[in-house]
Amino acid sequence: MVLKKDIERRISELLKKMKAESIDVILSTTFENSSRNPKYLSNFSGSFAYVVIAPDKQCICSDSRYWEQIKDQSPLELVKYDRSNASHILKDLLNGYKRIGFEAKTTTISAFNDLKEKVGADNHEFVACDELINRLRMSKSTDEIELIKKAEEIAIESFVELLNEIKPGKTEKEMAAFLEYTMVKKGADKPSFDTIFGSGPNGALPHMFPTMKKIQEGEFIVIDFGAKYQGYCSDITRTVAVGEPTDEMKTVYETVKRAQIESEKIASSSLSGKEIDKVARDIITEAGYGDYFGHGLGHGLGLDVHEQPGVSAMNEDKLPQGAVVTIEPGIYLPGKFGVRIEDDIYITGETNEVLTPVSYTHLRAHET
């Protein structure tokens, strides 16, 4: 559980970064869960709020649907938003601050224009603050790690139950629904994302959502799934064999497994995302499958299922201590099958801790 001290620590760190960037105030907004930053800064999990952070003001503003929820969840001062102040509440909250930090990546053009109109563009300077908060979110606290571990536990236990349910003749949709239901039954808020479930040729589509296709004997199934617990995500992929795989399937599987193990083994705060990605990519390329591994090796994980830092050729920065990242190499042969294996790991410094201890040695459906 996220405690008051966690929120106070996050805000204290953010204020230091704001001072260094000469930002007077930050406005963090969520509308229909467009951003997880308000959750990070206030612990409020509802779908609409303005969170205002300045040296002399830390408050959360929302409408009557969420007043009691905010009182229960957040240590920040509640500012009530209603019909009487809707037209001027933002101007009141931001009055006196010159440089306003806002989330450029999740703010639509229309919302930004509306913000400038309500606050008064002539009196303020608007600067993107996304990276300030993203950098804070990369390194997880002990409490955050415990929540992620619980999300992993729920997902893993549910997956083990799923293995006994997968049989030829059942549909992809049926099996994905079983997995998602089981995760919620075991305590998840909800799935971290819509489950990816691709059997046979559908597994060659990296983000293939389940269809009414029936599972067949002799197929591989790529299952990418996760549970969300108290706002924090898990993200796991396993490739399951239904019956006996062919020699080609075994070769591809073993190649992906080796790429996964070797890149996971070296992941640490002394290496960049690019360097870790290269280890897995070189193994797959040397095996002759380089053209069939098109995505990055991994990504950060936390309140969002995809967040910083990236584990790919695009990220030349070293991974920060405290980050949780995925390691997920894959090979996808169009019209045949796909293989992906994904673990979540915690960067503890010069080493890491694997948070997803599920065997991936020739997982077989209905044989567990």
Q: How would you name each of these model-derived features?
A:
Residues 1-364:
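Active-site neighborhoods and metal-handling regions in enzymes and metal-associated proteins
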